[in-house]
Amino acid sequence: MNSNPTRRDILRGAIATAGFSVAAGNVADGTIPSTGGSITDVRGIKVGHFTDTRRPTGCTVILAEDGAVAGIDVRGSAPGTRETDLLNPLNTVQQVHAIMLSGGSAFGLDTATGAMRYLEERGIGFNVGVAKVPIVPAAILFDLGVGDSRIRPDAEAGYRACKAASASMPAEGNVGAGAGATVGKLFGMSRAMKSGIGTSAIKLEGITVGATVAVNAVGDVFDPASGKIVAGARTKDGKSLVNSMESIKRGEQLPPLMAGTATTIGVVATDVVLSKVQTTKVAQMAHDGLARTINPVHTAYDGDTIFALGTGKSSKQANVTLVGALAAEAIAQAVLRAVRAARGIAGLPAAGEI
């Protein structure tokens, strides 16, 4: 008999330790809390998209105008980020005011400048005496291979995303940072599929953990419940899905790929009170949600990055293991929603279209 604890056992123990009952789902009868909703279900969080109409690209802002404690964990080998060193628990700044996710590769990091302008106009930022400096970390994904690469999100795009932000359910699929996202690229873009951005939330009594993810992975996306591929690499004729890893094991050769031409980026947020050390741990655990749904993941071609935010709006303390475990579940659900909400474009079909 296997005596090692399962993921469900760990979640059950964490909930018992934290003293919370599950609002949607019953741990006692073996069910994991149900997911749905969005990251905006977390108090203190707003989301806004800017989607460029000239080619599939854009940016997505996660606003925390009252400030949120933040952490980060980077697992891919080709990340593109801004203002992430300050999230190290050893460093001074304790709160951020927004996280920017953007297409456009490194050019897209300029969207954070637009978010800073938006926040400064509203008197929001880290008080340095002579000014308030908005703290806006950012991460980007590579979508320059979809359409005209000279068109990419800039500071104005970031500003417009902030102006569009609200606490309502955000759009999913081919919008914002997910507008140019694709998956299943191990055998080249000619066999890839369209992806997008997705969101989800898990609610327990008195606390919420939410996620939003722009899925631009080199690997395939799987539904962990069934083990089936939802979106990914296609056969050479483009008419059906293949399992990339199984194809490789059967001897199919990979074409030359350039590092950094993929990347999945996302944010998890909760309304519980967390420290910088704890948010960093939550971001680390949240990557398990990518590992459950994407294969291969965290590759040399990806810059997979997850931020974690704690708004503290519930005023509740919570077991960090519980929050991290729920964050991984929320990330996994957001990944699935990202590919299922996507719609195909020329040469890139979406899930359900083949």
Q: What is the predicted role of each segment?
A:
Residues S21-I32:
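Bacterial Sec-dependent signal peptides at the C-terminal "C-region" and cleavage site
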Residues N2-A18:
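N-terminal secretory signal peptides and thylakoid transit peptides that target proteins
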